[in-house]
From Swiss-Prot:
Any one Gene Ontology molecular-function term assigned to this protein's record: acetoacetyl-CoA reductase activity
Keywords, alphabetical: Cytoplasm, NADP, Oxidoreductase
Organism: Acinetobacter sp. (strain RA3849)
Family, similarity comment: Belongs to the short-chain dehydrogenases/reductases (SDR) family.
GO terms of biological process kind: lipid metabolic process; monocarboxylic acid metabolic process; poly-hydroxybutyrate biosynthetic process
E.C. number(s) listed in UniProt: 1.1.1.36
Amino acids binding NADP(+): G14, G15, I16, R42, N90, A91, G92, I93, T94, P185, G186, Y187, T188
Entry binding sites for substrate: D96, Q149, F150, G151, Q152, G186, Y187, R197
Annotated pathway: Biopolymer metabolism; poly-(R)-3-hydroxybutanoate biosynthesis
PROSITE patterns registered for this protein in UniProt: ADH_SHORT (PS00061)
Protein name, entry field: Acetoacetyl-CoA reductase
């Protein structure tokens, strides 16, 4: 087994995912990044923009809505690296609509991507961690999974489900030194958010006691705390990083 620690990250190429990968690589981790579809140009551009070497990241083609194929791909990647120390379930989508107007497709797309795929990704990783008798899993939820959000019944349900899943899995993993936690970000200055109109951003910031969006680095730092030696006595918890938008 390699001495280098390995982290599997879903949604690795997104705004928050990229920063999580950056901080993990800086801490000495090898990254297994799930992607669909494989796009060599995009992957190379991402590696260059993040300052990564090819050896820092193993890209794995995983259509997370194809359970058998995705499971096999993840198992193959873990076998190739010989270990997996950290899992960050970060992939997620939105399909916003009021519940009255929400289609079954909009509901299913979000539940399947944000919640159902947790089983597909986590089970092969969790089983390897049980074998190793160690591991850290961090699931990325959302402030809206805690408080709910108008027009996001599907998204809020999926992100709340992540929290319940985490609490249950934390109890199963504890005896094998596997810590399972949630990071629940508030509004974060990812490219998708900062591309919104300035007046929309200002209206969001006005609702936040700290009067600003989170930086992706602040979300990633919370993840890094939970996977570090300093987070070794934390499990089944939800770490809210929302600037005071929701206090509970």
């Amino acid at each position: 087994m390699s001495e280098q620690k390995v982290a599997l990250v879903t949604g690795a190429l997104g705004g928050i995912g990229s920063e999580i990968c950056r901080q993990l690589v800086t801490a000495g981790y090898k990254i297994i990044a799930t992607v669909v579809p494989r796009e060599e140009d995009r992957e190379k551009q991402w590696l260059q923009s993040e300052g990564f070497q090819d050896s820092d990241v193993r890209f794995v083609l995983t259509d997370l809505n194809n359970h058998e194929a995705a499971t096999a791909a993840i198992q193959e990647a873990i076998a190739a690296e010989g270990r997996v120390d950290v899992l960050v379930n970060n992939a997620g989508i939105t399909r916003d609509a009021t519940f009255k107007k929400m289609s079954y497709e909009q509901w299913s797309q979000v539940i399947d991507t944000n919640l159902k795929t947790l089983f597909t990704v986590t089970q092969p990783v969790f089983n390897k961690m049980l074998e190793q008798k160690s591991g850290r899993i961090v699931n990325i939820s959302s402030v809206n999974g805690l408080k709910g959000q108008f027009g996001q019944a599907n998204y809020s349900a999926s992100k709340a489900g992540i929290i319940g899943f985490t609490k249950a899995l934390a109890q199963e993993g504890a005896r094998s030194n596997i810590c399972v936690n949630v990071v629940a970000p508030g509004y974060t200055a990812t490219p998708m958010v900062t591309a919104m109109r300035e007046d929309v951003i200002k209206s969001i910031e006005a609702q936040i006691p700290l009067q600003r969006l989170a930086a992706p680095a602040e979300i990633a730092a919370a993840v890094m705390y939970l996977v570090s030696e300093h987070g070794a006595y934390v499990t089944g918890e939800t770490l809210s990083i929302n600037g005071g938008l929701y206090m509970h």
